[in-house]
Amino acid sequence: MANILRKVIENDKGELRKLEKIAKKVESYADQMASLSDRDLQGKTLEFKERYQKGETLEQLLPEAFAVVREAAKRVLGLFPYRVQIMGGIVLHNGDVPEMRTGEGKTLTATMPVYLNAIAGEGVHVITVNEYLSTRDATEMGEVYSWLGLSVGINLAAKSPAEKREAYNCDITYSTNSEVGFDYLRDNMVVRQEDMVQRPLNFALVDEVDSVLIDEARTPLIVSGAVSSETNQLYIRADMFVKTLTSVDYVIDVPTKTIGLSDSGIDKAESYFNLSNLYDIENVALTHFIDNALRANYIMLLDIDYVVSEDGEILIVDQFTGRTMEGRRFSDGLHQAIEAKEGVRIQEESKTSASITYQNMFRMYKKLAGMTGTAKTEEEEFREVYNMRIIPIPTNRPIARIDHTDLLYPTLESKFRAVVEDVKTRHAKGQPILVGTVAVETSDLISRKLVEAGIPHEVLNAKNHFKEAQIIMNAGQRGAVTIATNMAGRGTDIKLGEGVRELGGLCVIGTERHESRRIDNQLRGRSGRQGDPGESQFYLSLEDDLMRRFGSDRIKAFLDRMKLDEEDTVIKSGMLGRQVESAQKRVEGNNYDTRKQVLQYDDVMREQREIIYANRRDVITANRDLGPEIKAMIKRTIDRAVDAHARSNRKDAIDAIVTFARTSLVPEESISAKELRGLKDDQIKEKLYQRALAIYDQQLSKLRDQEAIIEFQKVLILMIVDNKWTEHIDALDQLRNAVGLRGYAQNNPVVEYQAEGFKMFQDMIGAIEFDVTRTMMKAQIHEQERERASQRATTAAPQNIQSQQSANTDDLPKVERNEACPCGSGKKFKNCHGRKSFS
């Protein structure tokens, strides 16, 4: 262990020597930059851009560019970055994390790499943990960037898409981590390119990087919507409809367990739901409900595929074990369809439309860097997950803070009495005190005790970021007492008031140890900024959460040996510190394992998400005929349908293929079993494909022009992809919950999730292509366009149109609803001029 530690220290020292060498080169430009006029210094930005365009790298520009920012900061802000800040800036440019202590000027440090990377013109995102810090930093540091000719934008949650787009198009964009993530997800849900707000993700510099990439890594960003009661009503209506069908109205393919409406079933659906054409593009969602209702009623069998529990819950039956699968639900809306079939309550769920973890969100940037005062304890995770090194940067001045040994008490009550007594003593002499707590409840408890003791104080628990910063800024004033949860006020320095240095500086009192050593170090670091005096003292009790969960038995035994009888007895021991640190390391290890597992699961989703989003973006940005892509989908759909029956009895296989063709591909009368008999599978595939291409061309010929064709193709694909992707996300969530239980059966749940998730993804792709094929072949495009033309004409001359419709209807001969329309369109009368009569 000692050898490893020595090697790490030597590596850090070697890295610092390299950084110092580059920093000295930056400093060598100081006199040259100081001699430039404002105009000449500002002109450097354009010069750097031109040099970059001609082939110079950012690394080659770094010394001079950093020197320009230093001089600009001195002229605009009156601040001149120190050498250690230059070193921190170099680390950031390299895509790593400089560990810089509180008060060492991380915000100013960031200006140098942000400016340098903005020169490339691809956008730089400065990420903060809340909107107050985004606004503050963009306003303060934005003065330097604007002075140097770069544009600065602030991305806030309340902004409109147009305002967000403007912010993202700036050279430098300030935003919170959550808003960048949500904007990414929303960009991949829009249907028009002009509705997207983000540019490709280039360089992100994350402030308080440990908070964003470590502490929040377990919580995914989710865009979801509650499933409305109207949706549940559609499940019920679809169920009521399919219960009216007879065996001639649907066709079951036994080998593949699929089902579809026959022509008579389609007629009944159009009549039941008052539709002109069931497979029009706007009816995609309805056909999904009907398909599920068909499966629920005629494929899924009670007490074989599922059971109904005593409390009315649908439970899936494992086909291999015969046991019910608690917590599992059929995906793609089938479970709700079965609930409608059995007349039990349809469980309302919020449906996830898109999700991503911060881990995978920020790994999409070309380059990622971050700043924090406490990251070394998480170095392994930063390296393994984000490929980022942690480089400790020396302080500009030596640390003068005194960190006292922890004090341990037998009970919570005795500990809190000691805390209040310490606060009272220090407050009496005017020393400012920051009391750090792990939970809001503890803050409130200590506040009540201080009120009882007559000590005025402020309570801060991260509920109001703007008020929070103001309170923290005043926490270093003489006589100030501030109670704060450990994370409250991060990003805002506590500056000492007049006369406070002589009183010992700010005293930080920790009321218990956090699970993470890093959080404790952050609390300590609120005191002693930039070489200021300060103190830190932690109070612990055997009843603290961390002590109860880890190591308390050993400490209790130690106390028993000490024969401590008094409740208020305090003990100081080196063993105590080692025990606490050991407990924290165990918790940190457990938390890292949890985050690593979250990432392993999300990596499966990531690969699939990237495929879907890339294809989706290709469709949105395409200014071309998407016919080749749709034809390829039709071809694969036909191939799958034919291959599914390759091992069936030949007669049954031909019948099933004909049924597929009639329900999903071509008009019923245009295909028969007779013409397919005697053909090999490849010949059948080719015949069906050629028939489908003819229908495809007929469909598109009904659209008015090439622009309308492209728009129709885009809407068709996007509607179906989005519907299936949303269902797939839901299915993956359910799968993840289910495979977690398999760990008890000695199976690796992540491996099973990967395997089953991949198969589900392939199935989803097949379902997308099937729905695109069926909708493309069956959509009544002519009718849709005719109605649009009618609506346009109605706007111009409503009276003439109305009279014309009446005349046309009156002049029609007596025709049965399923006969060909006499107008010559080739459609059934009910779907053409007779449609109004049967509405």
Curated annotation (Swiss-Prot):
Keyword Zinc: yes
E.C. number(s) listed in UniProt: 7.4.2.8
Catalytic activity: ATP + H2O + cellular proteinSide 1 = ADP + phosphate + cellular proteinSide 2
Cell compartments where the protein resides: Cell membrane; Cytoplasm
Membrane topology designation: Peripheral membrane protein
NCBIfam families: PRK09200.1, secA
Protein name per UniProt: Protein translocase subunit SecA
Species the sequence originates in: Streptococcus pyogenes serotype M12 (strain MGAS2096)
The organism's taxonomic lineage, starting at the top: Bacteria, Bacillati, Bacillota, Bacilli, Lactobacillales
Gene responsible for this protein: secA
